[in-house]
């Protein structure tokens, strides 16, 4: 990680920089969800950071529209950043005066869910963000795995809903087998 003989910044320096970026509303901290699961897998709770404005990350990577469409990794992160921004805005209307709690879920079994919305009354929702239709089936399976782990934990009920948010789809729908909503980011607040 050393470039031209320079040492990488220390963990304390990086933490301080992230704190400044967070206070300037340039990045959004996303903490891990310490889900009430009864399993041998270890739940990861270390914070992740996403740009508050997805264009910041795209600009930092030096990409234009064409470059973004060719770089699936950056496009996916930008899409997740947009989804988080919208989720925080719309979730804030569910309980006026209460800041919405949005987390991610990851464990040592390799299960990852992009966002978990937690409401003060105990309701929760699991949400994944994907680039395209080809990822929906696997994404729904991951959401269902999380629901099963939480159900087996015994202290939290079923989610209020599960959803897969896509970059684009002409088929917004509810999966018949699981009840999972599938829709595009552009219809998120409609």
Regions found by a protein language model. Name each.
Residues 1-123:
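Accessory nucleic acid-recognition modules appended to NTPase machines
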Residues 50, 103, 125-127, 163-165, ...:
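Hydrophobic/aromatic beta-strand patches that form the interior of the parallel beta-sheet core
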Residues 59, 136-138, 171-176:
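Switch/connector loops and helix/strand junctions flanking conserved nucleotide-binding motifs
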Residues 92-96, 145-158:
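Arginine/glycine-rich "motif VI" loop of SF2 helicases in the C-terminal RecA-like domain
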Residues 122-135:
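Active-site ExK catalytic segment of metal-dependent nucleases
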Residues 122-124, 157-161:
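Short glycine-/polar-rich loops that comprise or flank the Walker A/P-loop
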Residues 132-152:
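Mg2+/Mn2+-dependent nuclease catalytic core
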Residues 165-190:
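Domain-level recognition of nuclease-like catalytic cores that cleave nucleotide substrates
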